[in-house]
Amino acid sequence: MRRTPVVASRALSERCGHDVWLKCENLQRTGSFKPRGAYVRIFGLSDSERANGVVAASAGNHAQGVAWSAATLGIASRVYMPTGASLPKIAATRAYGAEVVLEGETVDESLEAAARYAEESGAILIHPFDHPDIVAGQATVGIEILEQLPDVGTVLVPLGGGGLLAGVAAALKLHRPEVRVIGVQATSAAAWPDSLAAGKPVKARSMNTMADGISVALPGAVPFAHVQDLVDEVVTVSEESISQALLLVLERAKLVVEPAGATAVAALTSLPDLELDGQVCVVLSGGNIDPLLLTQVITHGLRASGRYLTITVTVPDRPGGLVALLELLRDLNVSVVDVIHSRVSGELSLGEVAVTVSLETKGPDHQTRVRSALARAGYSVA
């Protein structure tokens, strides 16, 4: 297991007026914090339990954490993954030593299959977050933060099922009760605000977020008790703020994180009223993101920050029609990323062509100027 570094972030420090440090769990074994809990859980098994092996269900990080931990301890592992799981994550899980079984369309269906296998075979089911040993393993993140940043005043942690937040909060509050601990969820998959208000785990109203690593419908009972007693605040962040945070970490800290790993950064950058005390530590919980998804999220972040604009312009279908448009965009100091034309739209008149251009812009104000200039030049813009 790696003792992951904490890295100072000048960009975030300047934004929020506090010294901000990044706890880089994206640099942990398998690319996320998950092996910490999985290793502790599997290490605690008896010899007879170890002989039957372990089983888990996951679409990504937990799968790899269990596979690596079991292999490190010399124990057989089987991991059930949804049939739609990404090929890189399937390949990584196998590479870490697990037998991978693709069953079910969702993680919940895969978990049902894993539970059936555990009952039939005697294998021990390793839950991703709802077990005391899992929480204890994740607590090592909090212990390291205290050792690396003795004066830390606020810690922000991504929040899904609750195992990571519960463990970090338990470690911090045991040694430094005054440290402020904040959990961060995606607004579009936020079970925790309703759960804390109800005093018990409650299912999320929706599950539609790019942050699949924290997309958990029902909080765990074990972590819920810790979060309820120890965590100072739980906040939620939008999809736009998550993609912008991922882009910021990539550009300024030179670190690759997955959307779930960027949620705590998103809280710093998008919630101006967030209460922070002293030195701030932000946990980057993971960095496992498919290259294609990374491209999509980067584009999403660029759009959200006004740095990427796609518009469709109607131009005359004659020689020089496209040139005139591109010259105008050049004069507006716009970089053209892509150009697509179509003559088959039912909304076009004879002698017209629709040109879809993707542009690199310098912010929302620049985009407004571009649209205004095109309109003044007589172009129909969509």
Residue ranges: model-predicted function:
Residues 1-382:
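PLP-dependent amino-acid enzyme catalytic core
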